[in-house]
């Protein structure tokens, strides 16, 4: 169909070309054509004309024609002539391009021929590609099959190679196991042997193989030989631990740990021999450490300084001697029984190295038992930490530690239990309780739990003993013989000083611990000493002496408690209240002693309201003797009061506080007297005998710099 169309088009183009050659003049032909008026135009229907006019109303061309006044028919003829001219021009242009169109037709026909040939060629290519695709698919299937077979062969080769490697026994391995020395190479060979033994035991398929039947006897012989050889080697190393002056930790770290794989090998392939090695190590270390601790304890015992006996109690009379008690030394030589003093340093030095006994003995030094206790347990902690970590690393067992330390624990208990049962040093016992607390914290920070149960046991044994000794002090106060304790001396009693130092010691030791049970015991002790000191005070014949005795003891107690810390707590507050109340009583006693009439008048008469009972109004005759008596001897009385206070109170500052309080109270009494005189008719007559308040204030300042 395309060929026919192209040929027809070519023929048409040829005709146009021939016409052009013949000089065919279309213009002349067309030029004779003319539009004639339609004879029937008058009969044209006007239907729809209005609509067409409305549509053309907005047309710009029509509007221009109408506005110019031209006739539509003439304008239409002009347009028709223009169209004819354009048509003729187009035909001429088409005729001019006829040769090009013929040439284009020839080119299209050539292209069509070429495309036809290409179509034939591509069809052949398509058939060949289809054939090649089929061949490629076949090759791909063959390749996948060959890849799978190769993979299977490689897997088989790998397993077979591993099997051969795991099951064969190289001659070099036999030489090393049988004849080699136990060293790093030997342990590497043991690892290889271990892998072979595990391989044989783990795989059921291997056990049924014929190859194993040839190799298994040789592997068993090597296993037995290796076990025998490493057992002898380890035993020799364990024997070295028993040699005197051997540094066990260095031997463990630098020698035994290098061969810890031997233990792993024995545990896996020689269980019975491993248990023998384990038992041998436990027995060796048990005996070695027990001997070390026993020797250390014996050396420490030579350094012990006895602090207290069963008779060193707060309420026991210092001069008491008996058949089974020694003469008592003065308190100043035995202050460590009741006062903490420098013993608190043991808490600050809690993590210092353990004592070296022979150095201390050479220096002739003696220590309270808590120092030896700390040193012993410091050595125990360090030794236990090292041994626990070694056992875990070397044997892979933590439980072995407890079997080893059963001996050392027993040795320490044999020493500590008799010491504890004969310990009457309450401060020392509390220090040991605090030491154990700090040691538990140290072991916790180290993350070593091996001493938890032992330290708990020691702590549990210390508390009942402390309670018993503390109760002995409490009983000594409750059951004290006041007749033998009493001394005709208003200065602080030695029992009260003991109590103050004893209590201050425990307050100091409880600052960072907040032990409620200890606070309760101290309160019980305070109540007991309160009762005792009041009983002793009542033995003084004069009330003033009783009060002075109580003030001196309370003041001394407060001073000692303040040394223990800035806040003495409820106990200090209690004694401060007691001091305050007794100071007020003493001031009254002192003033009554020198100004009894003045005080009696102020208390009885100055407070009366004369308006209610005019008959009992205060008169000049009643107050005049008081004024003259005060004016004649008030300075002398103050001097006597000052001397009395200085001789009565051992604490100068306390005496000055009391004197200041007494003079202040005297000034108040005298001021009330002068106020009464001002209210009496004619009282101004006594003004010349009255001592001015300024004079009294001036005199008071002479005796009190802090007034």
From Swiss-Prot:
Disruption phenotype: Lethal when homozygous. In hemizygous plants, male gametophytic mutants characterized by very short pollen tubes. Male-specific transmission defect.
GO process terms (BP): pollen tube growth; protein transport; sexual reproduction
Reported tissue expression: Mostly expressed in roots and flower buds, and, at low levels, in seeds, whole inflorescence and mature flowers. Also detected in pollen. Present in pollen, buds, leaves, and roots (at protein level).
Segments traversing the membrane: none
Cellular component GO terms, alphabetical: endomembrane system; endosome membrane; GARP complex; Golgi apparatus; Golgi membrane
Keyword Coiled coil listed: yes
Chief place where the protein resides: Golgi
Known function: Acts as a component of the GARP complex that is involved in retrograde transport from early and late endosomes to the trans-Golgi network (TGN). The GARP complex facilitates tethering as well as SNARE complex assembly at the Golgi. Required for pollen tube elongation and other polar growth.
Record family assignment: Belongs to the VPS52 family.
Subunit (UniProt): Component of the Golgi-associated retrograde protein (GARP) complex, composed by VPS52, VPS53 and VPS54. Interacts directly with VPS53. Binds to VPS51.
The protein's name: Vacuolar protein sorting-associated protein 52 A
